[in-house]
Every structure is written in C-alpha cells, then in structure tokens.
Amino acid sequence: MLLLIPVLLILAGIVVYFVGNAIFSTEKGLQANWGISVPEGLREVEHYEESSFHGDGYRLTIYEVQADISLNGTFFDYGDMDREGLTEAQVALIENVTNQFDPKNGIAIPPREVYKRQVAKFGGILLCLYDATENKFFLYEEIL
C-alpha cells in the first residue's frame, strides 16, 4: 500500500507533463505571445526555453523549411524581410541565447548574410532570421 502512493504520484506527473506539452506547444506560444502562426511545411528542429514560472526569459526555436512550400503572406515570408546587417542589440541577443542553450543547429556568430524581421511587444523581442544557405529560420525570443 505504501508503494502505491509514490507510483500514483509518478504517473500523475507523467500525465501532467504530456498534457502540458500538448496544450503549451511551441506553435501555441508563438501565437499567444506574438500573434504568429507557423505554416504547414516548417519542421521544428530544436526548441529551448528557460524554466520560469512567469514564462519570461530567453527562447530559441529553429525551423527547417520543407520542400516546395509557399510562405507568401506569412510572417515567415523572407521576400518581405529586411536584408540589412544586424544591430549591436540583435547580435547581443543572438550571443546571449546561443551561450545559454548551445544549440546543435545554431547560427554562426556573427551570422553570414541573413534575412531578418523583428517584433517588439510588451517589452519583449522576437528576432526571426532566415538563413537561405541552411534553409532554416531561427527565432530568438526575449520575454520580459
């Protein structure tokens, strides 16, 4: 009987973990925080976020573009993105996030020529970079 209680607690924890991941997916977080929908054909390669009770801190999500998808008219339409160099603040954000999470598929610092789009909302920042050579999007978030 005493063994039953720890087993039930472990099972409850596992259920809460999987239900939480289903409810609070990366895509739902981008929609809730930034109003961005992730189109079909973008495959999440990596995702990192700081553990935080309030959801603040750094996040990094890397998406790979699958063959023959149209991104026209979406947030990820790199034809509408800026090609100018990165600002010092943007480079600092990339360095901070990269140093914190050490992603396997991270972008080179300083990044080679990339397409970029930045959104600022509620004091937070979302920096989206598209690397045409890698055919990947890198989303750097700083939630305050």
Residue ranges and their predicted role:
Residues G13-D82:
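N-terminal export/targeting and maturation segments
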Residues M1-V19:
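Hydrophobic membrane-insertion alpha-helices, especially the h-region
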Residues L8, G41, R112-E113:
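Intrinsically disordered, low-complexity segments enriched in proline/serine/threonine
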Residues R83-L144:
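Extracytoplasmic electrostatic interaction patches
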